[in-house]
Amino acid sequence: MKLGLIGKKIGMTRVFTESGNSIPVTVLDVSGNRVVQVKTEEKDGYSAVQLTQGYRRKNRITKALSGHFSQAGVEAGTVIKEFRVDHDIGSDIKIGSEISVELFEVGSKVDVCGISIGKGYAGTIKRHNFSSSRASHGNSRSHNVPGSIGMAQDPGRVFPGKKMTGHLGNAQCTVQNIEVVRVDAGRGLLFLKGSVPGSKGNGVFIRPGVKQPSK
């Protein structure tokens, strides 16, 4: 497994290729990724690298976290994320060092994990892509209803997992194999093709794609 980065969603824009094609991209700020802890198989039972991003005042964090950051010699961050890595990768990373956006290359595929935008209580048409009922021809006040949710006295219940109305969004989700369009090392920005989960200002986790498509 390879190392990833913590990012913050700035927004969406577009970039133009040399041929003049417009590509919609999402801009992520991945600057200031600092190594807080490096875990090894000998000491912790598995290999991992713990990163933090952002800055937070010491009086805004617990004493335990304050000591954790002080031991690493880094400023307190707003978010901490641990990435599982291979043993050879973790041995080359030093505590207190900063991981650059140049970890990713243009054209590579990445997986982005974030919290999707909350939509509140939604119906089955919006939540599960159901089709609405007929607008007329005998249909009265049943235009957007889901229809039957069960059978008869046998089994006499609604099966678990039945697609019904309910809360939509505000859940962790991962979008896989997003193409890296541009890397701005000077400003610590990452330009990804298309959209990623979450609204502006939300935190996301980026790591190399796990399910790389076969060529």
From Swiss-Prot:
GO BP: translation
UniProt feature coiled coil, ranges: none
PTM section of the record: Methylated by PrmB.
Record's keyword annotation contains Endoplasmic reticulum: no
Keyword rRNA-binding among record annotations: yes
Family recorded in the similarity comment: Belongs to the universal ribosomal protein uL3 family.
Protein name: Large ribosomal subunit protein uL3
Organism whose genome encodes this protein: Nitrosomonas europaea (strain ATCC 19718 / CIP 103999 / KCTC 2705 / NBRC 14298)
